[in-house]
């Protein structure tokens, strides 16, 4: 009895003493001549008293993928144009991954430094030369050792200021979409999987469009993923699906060279028709929740000509919450479109 009580008290004391914490600092040059020289380092430090196993979320400061990781503003409040990639990523699924580079483990007092080439993600032409404040996204996910589920944690953030002059954008070659479908670095089995996924995605989009055309009032399926019904939001989603339905998914160009184990896929929104597939994509089913076909719907909605959706929330739970709390963002969130199309579990 005494030993059981002591074990319980010790466990409680450990739980009470655990105090996770992070700090996030952006550092770099005070001035650059040309955005090709605008490279900054994010330093993530464990300021708590327990080791943290952090997800290498491609949206965040731990990852080098050119996503919209930074809030960048000049003295007039203007921001550069984002020209990087939009990604499908599900933290709860990444947490279960055994692939390499999915996590960053940081002990108390230790730091991780990551370099970011901002010219790969931002074009400063519209906002112009000037002094900019650079602040990195400060939300992270650590793995709860008790549940093995991701838990959000916000880091104390320190921004960096730099003066940008000279060349304000880096011109990069834009791949030309050819027909029929082209593959880069895809095995024969991957090509077969992509053909099946493209066909299923085409069906998903066609069915979704038909549903939206015939349901012009609140329904369980609509409100689950896009929130309270008003005609303007319905029209926004309808236009997205009208645009996506004009795509021939089987003529997309697919690149299979991405090795990020926890990521499904990504696209450059202004490079219509090219989809880059990553590690998590190949472990997904053809159809169903977070499927290969659904991933193609997600990524196609990111293309500017299809509506240019964002990544405000990832995963079914977060997407449902977004629909409830902020339907204006839900109708512009890629995962909400994917889950509406997958319709799993089925709703009328």
From Swiss-Prot:
Disulfide bonds join 186-256, 258-278. Inhibited by chelating agents such as EDTA and 1,10-phenanthroline. Its main location: secreted. Residues 1-18 form the signal peptide. GO terms for biological process: proteolysis. One of its GO terms (cellular component) is extracellular region. Residues 19-181 form a propeptide. InterPro entries: Fungal_M35_metalloproteases, Lys_MEP, M35_peptidyl-Lys, MetalloPept_cat_dom_sf. Zn(2+) binds at residues 298, 302, 311. One of its GO terms (molecular function) is metalloendopeptidase activity. Transmembrane segments: none annotated. SUPFAM superfamilies: Metalloproteases ('zincins'), catalytic domain. It comes from the Eukaryota. Optimum pH is 9.5. Active from pH 6 to pH 10.5. Stable from pH 5 to pH 10. It is found in: Secreted. Keywords: Disulfide bond, Glycoprotein, Hydrolase, Metal-binding, Metalloprotease, Protease, Secreted, Signal, Zinc, Zymogen. SMART domains: Aspzincin_M35. Its EC number is 3.4.24.20. Its cofactor is Zn(2+). It catalyses: Preferential cleavage in proteins: -Xaa-|-Lys- (in which Xaa may be Pro). The record marks 314 as: Transition state stabilizer. Belongs to the peptidase M35 family. This is Peptidyl-Lys metalloendopeptidase.
